């Protein structure tokens, strides 16, 4: 192939010597160092507002709102949006409330929550929603209630309430 154009040759000027001193610029102040910002959560941000619905995801006909983890008991289980006796046979279920409103109540059969009675005070419990927002809780109290007092579960006043049958 033939070139379509030939580049022109230009003369490069030679630098000239300067005997006059050049002015030194005044230093500009540097900004003060600041602490490294905390990275934003990986999930979407949420507002702690009563009534806000937790996102869910359907898997095998059941809708899940997140995962409950209790490291000291070696427990990590999915949590279903709505409770029913059928759903309880699959996994723990939300009984009422929301992590977003600060009143989440989760119930489960003893084959999921059977070790709750051995959960130590000050143990850490986490709930991770379907958008990867992580809610950390610390165990402050353990109570036994009568089946007739189930209304106490929904109105416990706690950010998280975990419930199972006693053995």
Question: Which positions does each model-derived feature cover?
Answer:
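Solvent-exposed, non-transmembrane regions of membrane-associated and secreted proteins
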Residues: 1-167
């Amino acid at each position: 192939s033939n070139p379509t154009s030939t580049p022109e040759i230009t003369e490069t000027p030679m630098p000239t010597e300067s005997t006059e001193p050049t002015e030194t610029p005044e230093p500009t102040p540097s900004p003060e160092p600041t602490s490294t910002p905390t990275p934003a959560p990986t999930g979407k941000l949420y507002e702690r507002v009563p009534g806000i619905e937790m996102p869910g995801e359907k898997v095998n006909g059941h809708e899940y709102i997140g995962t409950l983890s209790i490291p000291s008991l070696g427990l990590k289980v999915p949590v279903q949006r709505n409770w029913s006796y059928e759903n309880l046979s699959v996994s723990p279920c939300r009984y009422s409330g929301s992590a977003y409103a600060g009143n989440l109540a989760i119930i489960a059969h003893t084959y999921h929550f059977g070790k709750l009675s051995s959960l130590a005070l000050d143990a850490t419990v986490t709930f991770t929603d379907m958008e990867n927002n992580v809610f950390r809780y610390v165990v402050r109290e353990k109570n036994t209630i009568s089946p007739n007092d189930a209304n106490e579960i929904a109105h416990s006043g706690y950010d998280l309430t975990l419930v199972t049958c006693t053995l």
